[in-house]
Amino acid sequence: MALAGCPDSFLHHPYYQDKVEQTPRSQQDPAGPGLPAQSDRLANHQEDDVDLEALVNDMNASLESLYSACSMQSDTVPLLQNGQHARSQPRASGPPRSIQPQVSPRQRVQRSQPVHILAVRRLQEEDQQFRTSSLPAIPNPFPELCGPGSPPVLTPGSLPPSQAAAKQDVKVFSEDGTSKVVEILADMTARDLCQLLVYKSHCVDDNSWTLVEHHPHLGLERCLEDHELVVQVESTMASESKFLFRKNYAKYEFFKNPMNFFPEQMVTWCQQSNGSQTQLLQNFLNSSSCPEIQGFLHVKELGKKSWKKLYVCLRRSGLYCSTKGTSKEPRHLQLLADLEDSNIFSLIAGRKQYNAPTDHGLCIKPNKVRNETKELRLLCAEDEQTRTCWMTAFRLLKYGMLLYQNYRIPQQRKALLSPFSTPVRSVSENSLVAMDFSGQTGRVIENPAEAQSAALEEGHAWRKRSTRMNILGSQSPLHPSTLSTVIHRTQHWFHGRISREESHRIIKQQGLVDGLFLLRDSQSNPKAFVLTLCHHQKIKNFQILPCEDDGQTFFSLDDGNTKFSDLIQLVDFYQLNKGVLPCKLKHHCIRVAL
């Protein structure tokens, strides 16, 4: 029977040897292996009358002395992890002895006594120093549970490096030049970062905010896809590059209005000879189909400043140009760029930096390129609609169904949250009714004639109130500072004194969708304003002129036929009514300070 917790070397301790030598042979247990002594005791009946109480007291004293000896030698005697005991003397190799050494009953009792846990742990720590070569090593199947240096509870320091949550600081700029440093995780996507910035900036989350990868030294920029990892994209950017926080209403416009994007002559299918525009979306999202976008583009030669107009074909395998007219035979197609390890960008100032023939340039940039312009594949379209078509086709062919999932995720979240949250009431012509609050309780005016007269009366009352406010707010007759002439400056859609080119640039950056607008000061008339509006991917400007009626200044878009006391009323009206405009005002350009 092995001693649980106490090595056999305790038997060689002087204190223990003294106790063993002082013990008389007549007090040994009859169950011991010493048979001659047992037979002598049975023969002599006089020796059976042993004082039992004295024997028990002697055994208890021996146990107490042995326990103190274990405590004294626990720091020096090793205990192997495999359950075997380290001997003070190495065991001699050879055949096993036929005669086993006699074990006294007192030793058998002492071997069943426990030792302190701390002493055993200290003995285990010194195992490697006292392990002998004659004892075979038994591997421990659970070293992390019983090892002295590995606690059973996982701590952040005990996690492997791959599982540790890495954090990184990312600097994001706004359109007005302000910036914010945000600490993000390594697995944070562009959508997650946009939602975080929306929360920190107290903006309205309408799923149109995007993160823009901006390269000023290359004159390139693009909107990150919602599923892209921000840290991974930043690793491919140069030191001059930066992230911009911007609106983009046209990011998923293709899924809303696919009919308005691709002309019929630009779309072909390899597997079917004819197909309608309604099948366009399914063919782009289906990985087994092979849609193609074809047409003429201006292509800049690598390493040269010259541009050539070539017939270009975009497939899932890459972008090709034809070396012989409009032929698409394999021997006439030359690979221009690969879609797998590249991204498509818009040219910011293509005419000035790359001598582009038009202002509608695009670029296919390999991910490995940082500052060099030699490997950039620069292209140029004839108009903005053609450029949008090529860039949208590139994204669809590269990402496919993943792009559609990015479009559907916000809608699915909105549908799940709608039963638990009160929806914001949309302002439209179908959600407004005429009310009469002249009595003690309000009532709905159902008669159209009565509703029209009530609206006219309310309009006259509003004009009278605004006139009184103008009179009270005027500082001097020469420099009137009325509320109606300055209240619009508090709105996000008013951008102040910017040029026509700047307003067009802002409209293009935030998406050429129908109804996107902004208001600005007129450069030709100091008292007038300009409404810049996008319709059918074209930008138009409408002048807002002031007019006077009964000494009161009004603003009008249609030469005084429809008058408004301030620009806020004008914008509210044309958000509900098209009027003289080609479409209603739907989205306004906004700049947010981070």
Swiss-Prot record:
Regulation acting on activity, per entry: Phosphorylation by mTORC1 stabilizes and activates GRB10 constituting a feedback pathway by which mTORC1 inhibits INSR-dependent signaling.
UniProt-annotated stretches for the region Disordered: 18-41, 82-113
Effect of residue 476 to A: Loss of phosphorylation
Low complexity bias: start-end ranges: 100-113
Keywords: Cytoplasm, Phosphoprotein, SH2 domain
GO cellular component: cytoplasm; cytosol; plasma membrane; protein-containing complex
Subcellular location: Cytoplasm
PROSITE patterns listed in its UniProt record: PH_DOMAIN, RA, SH2
Pfam annotation, one family: SH2
Composition skew (Polar residues), residue ranges: 82-91
Family: Belongs to the GRB7/10/14 family.
Protein's name according to its UniProt entry: Growth factor receptor-bound protein 10
Protein source organism: Homo sapiens (Human)
Lineage: Eukaryota, Metazoa, Chordata, Craniata, Vertebrata
Gene this chain is encoded by: GRB10
